[in-house]
Amino acid sequence: MIAEDREYGTFESVTQAYQQIISHTLQLRRYEFETGCMIMFSANSGKCEMLSNGWISMISWTSETDTAGSLTLDICTEGGQCKTYSARGHILCSKNITSISQKNEGKEKVLTICHDNGKLHLTYITVLKSGLDCDIKDQKLEKLFEKEHAERKKQDDDYKKKALKQKDKRRSEQKILEDCDKKDEKKRMDDTEKRKLQEDRRNEKQDLKKRVDDTEKRKLEDDRRNEKQDLEG
């Protein structure tokens, strides 16, 4: 196997401008950098290119099984320098590293991106195969990817469990508040009905007393009128 074309990039003062999760398999990230350096080798010759004040757009897609996908990297500076790197095939993703290997007949491309501590590193190589079809895999790197992938999955599962627990807790607290509100409302209605009943009874007593007083008054008037008639007769 012969490493034909190799490109290495290092970018300083890198900040992530935004991350857009279009779906659980498709993501778009945009980084901004102050300075950068691209070193390019072809066969036995190489050159260095300096970059400044630009942005990097990274579009990554992964399959449902997280084993295949595509990665596209666009780099542009305010001076008009633009570069594009892309590959599709076997993909490995971790917290800070994304690497993809694209195999064609007699050739293999490897694109690796690492973003950590304000720096972004890029490696893009093309390997020519000779003789038997060899599988170039860095066992240590793959184990690191698998370990970080397992840790990320565990963190996601823990977060989902915690979120579900908090949701159940909020639902329980909301039900308690609703039950308290219902009890308070029932108590207010009972108090209102009780006051209305007391008011009705008080009014009935007053009406009864008034009728009794009126009856006694008429009877007294009748007695006086009869006495007067008896005296005159």
Curated annotation (Swiss-Prot):
This protein's major location comes to host cell
The cross-references to InterPro entries, in alphabetical order and at most eight, read:
U79_P34
One of its Pfam families is U79_P34
Location of the region described as Disordered in the Swiss-Prot/TrEMBL record: 155-233
Q: Where is the composition biased (Basic and acidic residues)?
A: 170-233
Q: Which UniProt keywords apply?
A: Host nucleus
**A cellular-component GO term for this protein:** host cell nucleus
Signal peptide residues on this chain, from the entry's feature table: none
Q: Which domain of life is it from?
A: Viruses
**Which cellular compartments is it found in?**
Host nucleus
Instruction: Give a yes or no for keyword Transferase in this entry.
Output: no
Asked if the Swiss-Prot or TrEMBL record annotates the protein with the keyword Magnesium, the reply is no
Q: What does this protein do?
A: May be involved in DNA replication.
What does the similarity note say?
Belongs to the herpesviridae U79/UL112 family.
Q: What is the protein name given in its UniProt record?
A: Protein U79
